[in-house]
Amino acid sequence: MEMAAAVGGSGRRDAEAELNLPPGFRFHPTDEELVVHYLCRKVARQPLPVPIIAEVDLYKLDPWDLPEKALFGRKEWYFFTPRDRKYPNGSRPNRAAGRGYWKATGADKPVAPKGSARTVGIKKALVFYSGKAPRGVKTDWIMHEYRLADADRAPGGKKGSQKLDEWVLCRLYNKKNNWEKVKLEQQDVASVAAAAPRNHHHQNGEVMDAAAADTMSDSFQTHDSDIDNASAGLRHGGCGGGGFGDVAPPRNGFVTVKEDNDWFTGLNFDELQPPYMMNLQHMQMQMVNPAAPGHDGGYLQSISSPQMKMWQTILPPF
């Protein structure tokens, strides 16, 4: 989830180009510089030293969606954002943001100009939690929030106004500082996968990719190990535990059935067919009508006839 932000978007590169910054420019202001030279000027509607901080309501977005909104930065990003009240007449800010919330950590730090004991700003550290409070999941996104110390935060003249601060200044960064690298690697993998040709196979009118087709073709192959396992299941009782005796597992991948039919090799079926067919017809007629004329002795006599006896002598013993 945290890696969902687009890194180095074209919009941000265009914004950096429009700033006309000198080569090698780095923006790493101190807490005092952020409050005195940027936040105080922003609230007083005075021009900034460099228009390098974007105006974004970061409480409407997840932190991993914010880097692409910034005007400058690779590992840390700066924003001016308004703050709303949690309750209509209260002084606490609403920390819900995107699909989670920001939670304060540590003590507030006063910010004062060098050589002065007068506090001009307050620095607060916050951690983003994904999900609903109080059971959100802690992430690696950190925010330093700077607000003016003497700002008038009384409820505004407009009835029902939720505005707590017109502007506060925020510095955002990821604690592990590796999310940008991971996102770039994911983009490379996705681009390679999109450019790779895909072979398709058809089965029952449905289109499948090559990987699915290979998996399907493997499912129709029976290996020696599969047959051995099936034979072992029979030896140990199989599904019901009743057992089927010992079964010798084949080793060549095929099930061989031994045929004990050598006894009829060389027999002349032309000699066997007439008496067999004659006695079969005789037996059928006798069973249908045992009292029919010409069938004295019935079924017992038919099976003791010379033709049937000859047939019985050539039948194999069971």
Swiss-Prot record:
UniProt subcellular location: Nucleus
Origin superkingdom: Eukaryota
Gene3D superfamilies: NAC domain
GO MF, one example: DNA binding
Pfam families, alphabetized: NAM
Induction: Induced by salt stress. Induced by dehydration, cold stress and methyl jasmonate.
Gene Ontology, cellular component aspect: nucleus
Sequence ranges assigned to domain NAC in this UniProt record: 21-175
One BP annotation, GO: regulation of DNA-templated transcription
Tissue specificity of this protein: Expressed in stems, leaf blades and callus. Weakly expressed in developing flowers.
Keywords from the UniProt entry: DNA-binding, Nucleus, Stress response, Transcription, Transcription regulation
Keyword Magnesium annotated: no
Disulfide bond residue pairs: none
Functional note: Probable transcription factor involved in stress response.
Domain notes: The NAC domain includes a DNA binding domain and a dimerization domain.
Record-linked PANTHER family: NAC DOMAIN-CONTAINING PROTEIN 68 (PTHR31719:SF186), NAC TRANSCRIPTION FACTOR 56 (PTHR31719)
Protein's name according to its UniProt entry: NAC domain-containing protein 68
